[in-house]
Amino acid sequence: MCRSVRVLCVAGDPESLRALRMAATAAEWELTQGATNQTDALGLVDAERPHSLVAFGDWAALVALVRERFPAMRIVTDRPADGSDAVASSLDQVRDLLRASRRPAGPVR
């Protein structure tokens, strides 16, 4: 069974989320529903089990929680945060940073 790579985008408001999702769109992965608050983001992490999280805005607490619960998840942010794997200085860097991330491997159980 093939398993597509899933990416969760989180931003502070719907307009920023739309822009981030557009910047993160690529044929190599599937975007999950995005979130604009921590509660929804954590719910999506639990439900969708994304491989990567892209968080633009003040999401240090979310990044720390996700890193603690899912140490292997790739996390891209727009500012330095404990637990972030990469920092994008602009929306234009998001795709390249996601492409540089690890891919899931092994059987799906």
Describe these PLM feature segments.
Residues 5, 29-30, 72-74, 85:
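A structural micro-motif
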Residues 55-57, 74-80:
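Short beta-strand elements of ligand-binding domains
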Residues 25-32, 41:
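A generic structural motif
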Residues 1-23, 64, 80-82, 89-109:
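Non-catalytic signal-transmission and effector/linker regions of two-component phosphorelay proteins
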Residues 35-36, 89:
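Short beta-to-alpha connector loops in regulatory alpha/beta signaling domains
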Residues 59-72:
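Short amphipathic alpha-helix used as the core "switch/output" element in two-component signaling
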Residues 15, 39-40, 60-61:
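Short alpha-helical
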Residues 36-52:
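Acidic, metal-coordinating helix/loop segments flanking the phosphotransfer/catalytic sites
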